[in-house]
Structures are given as C-alpha cells and as structure tokens.
Amino acid sequence: MNPPYDAIVIGAGPNGLAAAITLAEAGQRVVVFEANETAGGGVRSLELTEPGFRHDFGAAVFPFGPASPFFRRLPLERYGLRWVHPDAPLAHPLDGGRAVLLYRSLKDTVAGLGSDGGRYRQLFEPAVDAWPKIAEEVLQPLVHLPRHLPALASFGLRAILPIRALADLAFRTEEARALWAGTAAHAALPFSAPGGSSFGLVLQALGHRVGWPIPAGGAQSLTDALVAHLEALGGEVVTGTRVDDLSGLPNADAVLADVSPRTMLRLAGDLLPASYRKALEGWRRGPASFKLDFALDGPIPWTNPDCARAATVHLGGTFEEIEASERATAEGRIPDRPYVLLAQHTLFDPSRAPEGKHTVWAYAHVPLGSAVDISDTIEAQIERFAPGFRDRVIARSVLDPAALQRHDANLVGGDIFGGSQDLVQLAARPVLRPDPYATGVRGLYLCSSSTPPGGGVHGMCGYNAARSALRDVFG
C-alpha cells in the first residue's frame, strides 16, 4: 500500500495493532510505523541467551489472551496462533516443601485450600460466572453508562478494597493468603492502596474462566498472527521507522499513537490543549521491573514437584513477605527478598529450546529507574524453593530497567504497566472523561496502556481508541 492513508498508527505493540485492525475492518487504509525491526513492542520473542533458546522479551503468560473481547473475535488461529494450557494456571511454593496451586477448576482449587475453601468459593465464584458481563464494563473507560450494573457492583465492592483488607476479610490460612498475595501483587501497588484488589480478582477469576495460557512458539506468535490479519485486511506494518515528529508523517485523517504520555508530549508538543498537556506532564510512572532469562540444561528442580504443573510460579513466600517486598519497592528501596514472577514455558512448549533443554523467564519489581543489579537476589528466591537451580543454568540474560526501555521505548524507566495503576490513574487514564483517547487535537488519539483499561495484553486500549476515531473522524 502506498500513500495516501486514511489513518496512521504509531507503534506496533498489541494496542497499536488492535487499533490498526479495527480501522482496517471498517475499510480504512491503515499503516503502522514501528521503531524496532520487529513488531510486537512488549509482545516479542528473542534469543536472549543462547542460539535455539527462544525467550519472551516482555509479556509471557496471557490470561487476557482468550478472554479479550477483541482477540476472541479475530481468526488468529488461521495465522498459526495456538494457545497452550498448562495443567494448572499458577503455583505458589512455600517453605517446608509446601505449595498451593490455582487450578482451572474452581472446585479443585477450593479443595486444596482447606478451611479457606468455602470463603474462596464465595469470593471468586460470582466473578467467574459473570466474567463476560464484568469484562464489558471494566475493559472500557470508567465514565460510561453501565449495562450490567449488578455484576459491576458486586465486583466493584470487592475490587475497591486494598489487597490487605480483602485478605483479612476473606482468608485465614497461610496458603490462601499467599496465593492471593502473589496474584494481587501483579498490580505493583502497596497492599494498603485502595483499589489494589481489582487486579488479583480479575486475574484469579480469569484463571478459572479461561486459564493462564501461553502461545505456542512464544509471545511473538500472537504478534505475528495480528500482523498477518492486518495485512489480510489491506493494512501495512513498516518496521525500523521511528517517528520523531508528527509533521514528518504522510497525510492522514487520523493518527493513533501507541506511545507513552512522555512520547506523546514530544510528538505533539504545543499542539495539545493546555489541560491535556498538563495531564500528560503530571502522569506518574509505576515501579520498574528487573528481568532475567535463563537457559537451563534441565527443568527447575522444585522441592515440591507440583510446581512443575504450572507455567507460572509466584515466588515470595508468605503474604507478609510479599507485602513487605511491594512496600519496599513503593518506598524506593530494593527488597531483601523480592517477589518474583517466574514462567517455565518449555515444560509445556518444548519448541522454545533445544531438545532436553529449558527456558526460564523471571522478573521482580524495583524502584523506577533503578540501576541496582538484583540478579543474585532473584536467583536466591528461585534457589530457595528449588535447591540446585543454579547448577542447571547454562546462560542468563539480564535486562535492568534501562535495558527494558532500550528494547521498548514505552517502558519508560523500566515501567511495564504504562504508568502507576493506582485508583486515581485507573480512573483518569490519562484524563477522566467519556473519551480518554482523544487528545483534544482533531484526529489525534492516544491508544497505549496509559489509556483505559490499562496494562495487560488484551488490545482493548487500541480497539477503544480506534472506535473513537471511527466515530469522530470517519463516522
């Protein structure tokens, strides 16, 4: 396709591609410009350690994949996407060889939680059953007219609670509290923050509703399928093309930017209305991530073998330990025992490594922009629950916050969330209004995870922004 274009999308991450696909489905001529040599943003796979070992650069487990209303309606399997479902979505080891598992089956999970099983069912069963209605409400801007008010109210009354408050109300056993802490800590918020429970509620409900699957072959498989579908619709993706100024773009009726607020300020500058520019200037980043990838000569030697039943493992010990880790990060300190999110893809997808070998993906939260190397402390947490792990390491890759940003400009300071996900910035993302994607400049839209519904690989930020453009510009 050659100019003229109807719409230009800046950034070929999942939200940018979702925006482009939505526009192309409506008959618009669309081109996507991507600074990196490969599309995907945080949804890419790279040989980070040794040849033949395929590691996910960013997102590695996809609870929103089959649950996203946008992804679910696309024929991505036609382009090679296949979801692999582990035996269990999640494992959480504890000291003494114990472990608690989140099973796809709510019944099996309840059975493993002893005296907390009934309370767990009472908390999660309504969200699991009502997920399609809840998704319709929470995966769009906060300011809207609800269609499913009872389901939204039931979810919202729990979601508004801080992580600790919900734990104290719902659970008594160390196992149930630890399972909740590990999932809720995906929010990267202090456990005292209002609204922090929303992330854990959604993620655990999705674990029961659709699982936490991984794409066969790596995260790149999802990106490649999205690109292929866009091209089948007549769209185009141009990689290796950095956009530094809107004035350098071809003429188009609409520009949708899958970029950080900081980049939008650089691109649009004084074109933006003062109130919107002020909102972007005041945007607060979340904490950063420090990421390790490993090539192993065998599987992780877990003390509790049930940990090998899940692709995702949360390492951090008890509720109180994980709470302390997230508090330290929020206060600008490096945790002594960090909360570690780990994925062991090759147990379920051996195509990602040479025969008999394995990959491990792991990261921990650190203060924004931290330059402290915490490789040893992350490895110590793995070794704590899998003695002998270090002996199986062939090679490792270290991506500190600065390296993450070099790989993906949207990860400013190593923040993988598109900005803090506290209650204020979930509501005003980046502005509180019915259409938070419109910038105030006709035809210019923000469509990154710094817009509703925020972080996660679901494509809904791009989809919602494209619908706004179709209504306002092409309607």
Regions found by a protein language model. Give the residues of each.
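Extreme N-terminal leader/targeting segments of oxidoreductases
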Residues: 1-7, 25-26, 207, 425-426, ...
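N-terminal glycine-rich phosphate/pyrophosphate-binding loop and immediately adjacent elements
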Residues: 3-133, 420
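Rossmann-like flavin
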Residues: 95-194
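Flavin-binding catalytic cores
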Residues: 119, 299-300, 333-336, 370-409
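Helical element adjacent to the flavin cofactor pocket in flavoenzyme catalytic cores
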Residues: 203-244
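A conserved FAD-binding loop/helix module that cradles the flavin
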Residues: 447-470
